Amino acid sequence: MKSSIVAKLEALYERHEEVQALLGDAATIADQDKFRALSREYAQLSDVARCYTDWRQVQEDIETAQMMLDDPEMREMAQEELRDAKEKGDQLEQQLQVLLLPKDPDDERNAFVEVRAGTGGDEAALFAGDLFRMYTRYAESRRWQVEILSANEGEHGGFKEVIAKISGDGVYGRLKFESGGHRVQRVPATESQGRIHTSACTVAVMPELPEAEMPDINPADLRIDTFRSSGAGGQHVNTTDSAIRITHLPTGIVVECQDERSQHKNKAKALSVLGARIRAAEVAKRQQAEASTRRNLLGSGDRSDRNRTYNFPQGRVTDHRINLTLYRLDEAMEGKLDMLIEPIVQEHQADQLAALSEQE
């Protein structure tokens, strides 16, 4: 491992030890804000510190094994120990390189997830409903909270569009690669000839932004309309114009929110989604520029990019970005998404490592 990387790891390890000592200090415990900040930093440093400690131990094991090679009686055992230690050292080195990759500050944030039916009419709306259920099941498995902000239901079920806020640890970091086009191939319930139809949906995942990072939005650039909520809401539904539709005139972005009975609360939520969408558009524009100079896993950020195909007759799901095919469609639709998410995260990390190597 390069000496510059070892020096960086040593500094992080020392900071980890320093933070650990500070967390046990009475003055820190008395200051709750400082205690929370240091606790977060400690959690962020722990994986690096633990992995670096293991790597240092392996280097010592390698030195010991090399010294044993000079002893004829110990040589065979030393060769085996040396081989095992070097293999473990290589694995730890790879882990440390990944842990040192620049972190996306948005990864730990909550996320807004939008699912929209595309081509395919009623079948696309039904598939949008299936996708949203899939994400909801995945969220439940990770103990995240799902809150529907707006839902435009299809005529025969599913959704023409549904927007939800998903809250929990690391939501955006896990779901951000879901943004893009999702295609389904199956026989619709209304198909009497048994022919397979192809329909499509688009998914957009955006981090929820703290107030301080919201883009500046001029109130004069907004057109705000109120209308009666059309979703489930018990006896009060359709009695007041509590639902909100906000149009950002410079970009043409439109956001609706009809979750709350309070017009004020719906407006606040809609503005939050609007801010996230405006920032997402800016990020996509920047990624498009970066993609012109090197291959970028996220493509141009264009939502028409084809991420996955879900083929029901074959029980197959294919991620076209990394040429991954699994015959475990039923599990995926029940929210077991880590088998699809983890490979794309690893591919992204490999791209980051390659980019860093090019810079060196």
From Swiss-Prot:
It holds the Pfam family PCRF. It comes from the Bacteria. GO terms for cellular component: cytoplasm. Methylated by PrmC. Methylation increases the termination efficiency of RF1. The modification N5-methylglutamine is found at Q235. GO terms for molecular function: translation release factor activity, codon specific. The keyword DNA-binding does not apply. Residues 285-314 are annotated as: Disordered. Keywords: Cytoplasm, Methylation, Protein biosynthesis. SUPFAM superfamilies: Release factor. It is found in: Cytoplasm. Peptide chain release factor 1 directs the termination of translation in response to the peptide chain termination codons UAG and UAA. HAMAP family: Rel_fac_1. PANTHER family: LD18447P (PTHR43804:SF7). Belongs to the prokaryotic/mitochondrial release factor family. This is Peptide chain release factor 1. It comes from Klebsiella pneumoniae subsp. pneumoniae (strain ATCC 700721 / MGH 78578).
